[in-house]
Amino acid sequence: DADFTWDKLSGADVLADHGGQPLAMFKYGVHKMGVEYGSLNAIDAGTTAEIDEAFRSGTGQYVHQQGPAPQQLEADGVGHVVASVGEAIGPVAFSSIQGTREFVASDLASAFIRAYRKSRQWVNNASAEEIADKEAAFFPGIDRSVLADTIRFYQGLGCWNPAVEISRSSYETALDVFLHSNLITQRHDYDDVVVAPPAG
């Protein structure tokens, strides 16, 4: 759909990933773009593999998936990537590291953060092709070039921002996402739950 606009989802058959975080992000992304999720004919086809197979078999006008699945659909000539939930929402802290305050103060936590910082630097500085070569085994059935293109898109989107700290704004957006889907019932104060990562 070269002329896709988010309002085309209203009344459309949409295969949606019904996992907790993916669905919460999709619902909030749709909301941010001015469409209420209840106006969609959302279809729960099961697991991510079952969702993919259902769309390939002709179910649904649209499908919500996480990369690289939609990019592989496009490469296979089954559909087109028409929008990005990540672009609609912006930076959000949902892939976060959790630990007790005692653990965060430990030498082990410092060593972990050193390795984590290095991996974040690498994923931002390495070519998408190099990263795809290292990660290909985790994505069976995905063409190497498709994986590289997906990684390149995520690099451009800033998914692996070099900073390992959780910013207040990305944390507040996470609260917005999960409150919108009623997965939490109140806003938790940033200063009560977020600490600076250990030096490393």
Question: Model regions: which residues?
Answer:
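Residues that form or immediately flank small-molecule/cofactor binding pockets and catalytic motifs
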Residues: 19, 47, 86-87, 195-198
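Short coil/loop linkers at secondary-structure junctions
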Residues: 31, 36-38, 79, 141-145, ...
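Secondary-structure end/capping motifs
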Residues: 105-183
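Conserved C-terminal helix/tail region of periplasmic/extracytoplasmic solute-binding proteins
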Residues: 174-200
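A generic structural-conservation signal
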Residues: 18, 39, 64, 82-83, ...
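Bilobed "Venus flytrap"/periplasmic-binding protein-like clamshell domains
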Residues: 1-75, 168-173
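Pocket-lining segment of extracytoplasmic ligand-binding domains
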Residues: 42, 49-138
